[in-house]
Amino acid sequence: MRELMSEFKELRLHGMAGAWEELTANGGSRVEASRWLIEHLLQAEHTDRVMRSIGYQMHAARFPVHRDLAGFDFEQSKVDQKLIRQLADLSFAEEAQNVVFIGGTGTGKTHLATALGVSGITHHSKRVRFFSTVDLVNALEQEKAAGKAGRIALGLLRMDLVIL
């Protein structure tokens, strides 16, 4: 019963937690027989919430296109594959460090940066925001002209990873 109660509370289903506690106290074996159904429903709810959260975060990140590391051709690039895979764990973000990709047009900088952002959302539950530098500067200028300076900066401070 303990794991069901913690699942109810983790999902903020406090009314169900109280009802389950009452049912198990009064219902005995009939209630225990339906335990598998409740466990299955809780797992489905948890999975659905995770998937909706990922979908929301992917939309909020505003990536130009969806890219991941599986789609990057390391054979055609001089990029250190081991280093990129190491960066994908996002430990640099936890340590408040920056990563800068330098290279000419078409070398995969945006692809790799987007892939790190996608990895951050899907595997590490990070909040990510992608901006082209030109779009960010324009948005900051518009914000300043509207007399609302600082709102974008406050929004970016809430992010775990900002990609420019």
Go through each PLM region and give its residues:
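Short hinge/gating elements
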Residues: 6, 19-26, 70, 97-103
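Conserved P-loop
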Residues: 53, 81-158
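Alpha-helix C-capping/helix-to-loop hinge sites
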Residues: 23-27, 75, 143
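Interdomain "pre-motor" coupling segment immediately N-terminal to P-loop NTPase/helicase cores
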Residues: 9-64
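Extended, charged alpha-helical coiled-coil/arm scaffolds that mediate oligomerization and mechanical coupling
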Residues: 1-7
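N-terminal pre-Walker A segment at the start of P-loop NTPase domains
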Residues: 67-88
